[in-house]
Amino acid sequence: MDDKKQFSRRLLAIGALFSLVLAAYFVTLFDAQIVHGAEYRARSIRANTKSETVVTSRGILTDRNGKALVTNRSVYTLELDTSLAPSDDAALNKELLRLIELLENRGIVWEDTLPLTAGAPFAYDFSVSGSHTALNSYLVSKKWADEDALTTDTDPPLSPEALLSRLRTEFKVDGELTDAEARKLVGLRYCLAVTKLNQLSTAAIASDISVELIAELKDGAYAPIHIGTSSVREYQTDAAAHILGRVTKIPRERWNEYKEKGYAMNAYVGYDGVELAFEDYLRGRNGRRIVETNTAGKVTGEIYSVEPEPGNTVALTLDIDFQEDVERILAETVESMTAEDDIDRGAAAAVVQVGTGEVLSLASYPTFSLKTFNEDYTENNTDPLQPFWNRATQGTYAPGSTFKPVTAIAALETGIITPKSTILTKGVYHYGDWAYKCWLYNQNGGTHGRIDVTEAIKVSCNYFFYDIGRRTGISTIARYASAFGLGEPTGIEIPEKIGVMTTPDYVNSLDGHYWTDGQTLTAAIGQSYSLFTPLQLANYVATLAGGGTRYNAHLLKEVRTYDSAELVDVYDKPPAEIIDIEPENLQAVLQGMRDLVVSGSVAYYFKDCVVDAAAKTGTAQTGGKVSNGVFVAFAPYDDPQIALAVVIEKGGSGGALASTAVQILNAYFTSVDEAKAVVGENMLIQ
């Protein structure tokens, strides 16, 4: 009995002790989860999470029909991660030296943000955008320089050698390393330090790395390395290189501008072409995410604090299939001419939609491919024909006789002549002490006889336009040229030259030049000092064909969200100018251009044109043995849809330009298989 009582007391004691332990456990659990739960959870998150920038996708570019021109391709990036870097300098240096050896053995060039040259004699190199600002900030943070004494226009007070020496000491670099070896190591250490200084977690040092390299870097084999993802631009066409443009890291000279807009120092932006022009549309908005990791450092979950927003889809006015045709036609023409006379030459073509100003094609020869830009850079950059030069918008050329319709409109609209007025042309026009000759007189001593303005345009009679040009006056001719957009900005969103219309003020502003009244005569036929771009010529003809309504030339058609679900913006600017032209005056000029292709000097080339067209030839004197060839046209004649201009440097007055124009018209109005035109002998035309 006593044993039973003793057992009961023991059991009761054990039960009481167990209850006490259980109660203590629940009190502790209540305190941890309820009373201090939020606090402990926050501590846990801080200890096992990190914040990362989520780089979003740049918007894509399409043509007018929705055909992709520039897209994005996802790639793996090699990043230095400040959170994975060992705190011990020796350990970190050892890991980075192993990484350098691996990258060099694999032939991988990594991005080095330290603005010092790679080898002795060391010098500062601030060619990378933001590098000067970043170094100044770092020097101030280390108290190696006074902030007030630093600018982005001058080198820091430390010499390059002194900076390298201080960095070796700061990062505890092994003294046995050569300066060249140390330079590589401190470059990566500096990158980590600046990344941390800017309160960022990672910095990409190589892009588009291979899966094989990733396999070697996995499982923390190289402590500070993180494999990230980003996107690179993928070009779906070899055409339109001058128009599309490239993306690069922010140019040094524009860093302050982009900084104010919230760009990161390592952001990629449009460098030229529409990539630059439409940067605000194409730019996405990066996101932020909180990444949870386990004790081994592996990601176990993620929470987005700011969702990334991809850039918009920008539709251009270009028809890329047509653009490819125009570039091919232009190249074939030039290469055929060069094969015959062994003269190297450039060329350009511009095609504009009548009634809208939409640019359907801008072609420049020679050109280049954005797909192989880096591989071909040295060859293209040293090519004397300058493939990177966009002749269609930045090449300026004397218009030659393609300017004569402007002179005709100016004379008609001011009452100097009427559509029925005739002039007896005599081959040589005497003005003061000068004698100005018609091209026909120079050729065989002939004249065009008595003609009206329509016939004068058809046969391109210089004598006729000398006379009406003198009577109309240079100020009136220049005023109408400006109204047609010649010597004025076209409105195009990419860089262009404005060109110049001959005027007394302009000529007198040139050193060693002065105005003479005789220059009115040469300006009236498109010579003298007048210089215009192919795009200006095409848009002028579009204005003429459209009855005098001039629209700004433009490449933007519309902007939609990345998935094209919503319309963001659309080009809808009103006409830039409306020229009041009497219908009978307009008809007299347009009929002359039509007669040229029906029964004039280019009729041979237009007999296989699939559409009724009108045109004007031009020969632009350059002072050399061979003049530039200029040709403008529009079609269809009765309901104009497109206008074009073709310029071939040293192209002379041959029929190659007319043939080129016919091929371009056929390419637009028919399928590619039908886009053929007669290629005859290089007949003399004016």
What would you call each of these model-derived segments?
Residues V299-A347:
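Conserved, well-ordered alpha-helix/loop/beta-strand core segments that scaffold catalytic motifs
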Residues V70, Y76, T293-S305, L318, ...:
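Beta-lactam-recognizing serine transpeptidase/beta-lactamase-like catalytic domain environment
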Residues S83-L84, I648-G652:
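A generic structural motif
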Residues T670-V679:
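Flexible helix-coil linker/hinge segments at domain or subdomain boundaries
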Residues E332-A339, Y365, D595, T670:
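Conserved helix-loop functional segments at active or binding sites
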Residues M1-D280, N286-E307, E340, A347-A348:
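Membrane-proximal periplasmic segments of bacterial cell-envelope enzymes
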Residues A90-E101, V211, A215, D219, ...:
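Solvent-exposed, polar/charged alpha-helical surfaces in well-ordered, non-transmembrane soluble domains
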